[in-house]
């Protein structure tokens, strides 16, 4: 009786749940925002990204969006980033809100991700001044 229960317990504790893995996507992006690493963030971009930074809004290619994000980090060097809110209940959609502290101000970063094939890609990235 103990062996089957032990097997079931080990089976569920040894394999991370998809819920845990989903949270890591936004956590990893938060770490990249803290480091100001536009290249690593852009690696998660879809082929086209709706990018809203402060008052500029448009749809850009992956390469263009990376350059715009790099320019943002040059103008606003990051100091700290933390996850404020995370929605990961839909298996094909992720949404996270980060608080980004920079040397020149505090921003609210909203990240919308959609699943394509077996990976999540950023389809919308919004960086707005935190009020």
Q: PLM features: residue spans?
A:
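Short, aromatic-enriched amphipathic alpha-helices that serve as compact interaction elements
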Residues: 21-37
């Amino acid at each position: 009786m103990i062996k089957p229960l032990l097997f079931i317990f080990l089976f569920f504790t040894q394999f991370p749940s998809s819920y845990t893995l989903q949270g890591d996507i936004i956590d990893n992006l938060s770490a990249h925002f803290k480091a100001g690493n536009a290249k690593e963030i852009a690696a998660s971009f879809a082929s086209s990204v709706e990018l809203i930074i402060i008052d500029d809004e448009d749809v850009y290619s992956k390469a263009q969006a990376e350059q715009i994000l790099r320019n943002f980090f040059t103008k606003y060097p990051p100091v700290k980033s933390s996850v404020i809110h995370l929605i990961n209940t839909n298996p094909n959609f992720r949404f996270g809100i980060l608080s980004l502290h920079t040397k020149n101000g505090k921003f609210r970063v909203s990240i919308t991700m959609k699943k394509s094939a077996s990976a999540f890609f950023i389809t919308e990235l919004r960086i707005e001044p935190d009020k």
